[in-house]
Regions:
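Short, functionally important structural connectors and interaction interfaces within domains
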Residues: 22-25, 53, 162-165
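Solvent-exposed "coupling" segments
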Residues: 20, 24, 28-31, 146
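Glycine-rich phosphate-binding loops of NTPases
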Residues: 1-21
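Mid-sequence acidic-hydrophobic segments that form the walls
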Residues: 14, 53, 57, 185, ...
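Nucleic acid-processing catalytic cores of prokaryotic defense/repair systems
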Residues: 1, 26-33, 38-48, 52, ...
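A cross-family structural signal marking well-folded subdomains
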Residues: 34-39, 62-286
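Histidine-centered nuclease catalytic patch
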Residues: 289
Length: 289
């Protein structure tokens, strides 16, 4: 019935704003309306779930489309929420980046790993578990979208030129799995837990670690799991934040798995022995200014 009232109001508003138009013009417009019929199996198909997943042309919705609909469609304040949060997020991330962001955001927030096929259900579970409102969820999404944009391009207004250079260097190396760790590190920077100098040291460490692994041909399969749990494992004791950078270094150096940081000797040997010219690897120089 709310939909019926909405259309009545819209039609009346249209007629008031366009006195030269009449009901016949609306009928003419309806003749161009295309309807899609989707037959459901009474036993297995849930109509609400199906309409959550398709757009007006019957094309499957993307993850970001489904999340947008979930947090906006049922909210009476949806126009303001859209303009204050969602539109701004769409303006700073491309469609593909927004899809990648939501997978990384979910992996950052969840205990396990999100897959594309289950990501929307995981998002709804996160929403319920965290007792979010639509606005609090959109506020958090926009906060991390801004971080994600900075990870890709830097942010001259928020961060120093050194931080921005180091972020772009990580992006040059295509080390995007590190974002699962950086979300928390940048939260600490925003909260004043660490300063610019410490943030730069952490980013240089991650860049050093990444380059050593690339040159020494250490497989990257385990990196996502490492970075997902790294913050919690390093700072499982709050006092470790008093020596923020040293705590991260100490943890990485104590690793005995395949995620161990390659030693200086291993790195030098790899530089001498590997045929680096045949590798499709992009290199970056650290910035110390």
């Amino acid at each position: 019935y709310r939909n019926y009232e909405l259309f009545c109001d819209l039609i009346q508003e249209f007629l008031n704003d366009n006195p030269d138009m009449g009901v016949s013009n609306i009928y003419d417009g309806l003749e161009h309306l295309t309807c899609a019929e989707i037959k459901l199996d009474d036993d297995d198909d849930n109509a609400q779930e199906i309409f959550e997943r398709i757009n007006s042309t019957g094309v499957p919705l993307s993850l970001s489309d489904k999340i947008r609909n979930f947090v906006l469609m049922t909210d009476t304040d949806q126009d303001r929420l859209y303009e204050d949060y969602w539109l701004k997020a769409e303006q700073i991330l491309s469609k593909d980046q927004l899809e990648g962001f939501f997978l990384d955001y979910l992996n950052f927030k969840m205990d396990g790993f999100a897959k594309e096929s289950t990501a929307y259900d995981e998002f709804k579970a996160l929403y319920a578990r965290g007792q979010y409102t639509n606005e609090s969820m959109l506020e958090e999404i926009y906060h991390y979208v801004q971080q994600y944009h900075a990870f890709y391009y830097g942010d001259e207004k928020r961060f120093s030129s050194t931080v921005n250079h180091l972020l772009r260097s990580l992006q040059t190396l295509k080390q995007t799995t590190v974002y699962l760790f950086l979300f928390s590190v940048f939260d600490d920077f925003d909260a004043g837990v660490i300063d610019d100098e410490t943030l730069c040291k952490v980013l240089r460490l991650l860049l050093n670690y990444s380059i050593r692994r690339l040159i020494c041909e250490v497989g990257s399969n385990s990196l996502r799991g490492l970075y997902k749990t790294l913050y919690g494992r390093v700072f499982n004791r709050p006092e470790n934040k008093n020596n923020y950078y040293d705590s991260i270094v100490s943890f990485l150096l104590q690793l005995t798995s395949k995620d161990v940081m390659p030693s200086d000797a291993e790195f030098v040997a790899a530089l001498k022995e590997r045929n680096l010219y045949r590798k499709k690897v992009q290199f970056t120089r650290d910035y110390t200014g």
